[in-house]
Swiss-Prot record:
Residue ranges occupied by any 4Fe-4S ferredoxin-type domain in the UniProt entry: 2-31, 39-68
GO cellular component, one term: chloroplast thylakoid membrane
Binding site for [4Fe-4S] cluster 1: 11, 14, 17, 58
Subcellular location, principal: plastid
Signal sequence range: none
GO molecular function: 4 iron, 4 sulfur cluster binding; electron transfer activity; metal ion binding; oxidoreductase activity
Protein name: Photosystem I iron-sulfur center
Subunit annotation: The eukaryotic PSI reaction center is composed of at least 11 subunits.
The encoding gene: psaC
């Protein structure tokens, strides 16, 4: 099941999220907006399993990567409010 993966401009290009992803959803692409001259990209969101390891690995105060689980997935995982 694919999940929505959003990359925000708080990305510092550290590659932590890319290394944390067990399904290789993320990759780094050239970007001049940060010191590292690269930013995370999510070209293979269909492979995202929703583990949120990328979110946990992100060192920025405001997460650069967010995985959005659909309502049905959230309920089935017992995460619904």
């Amino acid at each position: 099941m694919a999940h929505s993966v959003k990359i925000y401009d708080t990305c510092i290009g550290c590659t932590q999220c890319v290394r944390a992803c067990p399904t290789d959803v993320l990759e780094m692409i050239p970007w001049d907006g940060c010191k590292a001259n690269q930013i995370a990209s999510a070209p293979r969101t269909e492979d995202c399993v929703g583990c949120k390891r990328c979110e946990s690995a992100c060192p920025t105060d405001f997460l650069s990567v967010r995985v959005y689980l659909g309502a049905e997935t959230t309920r089935s995982m017992g995460l619904a409010y």
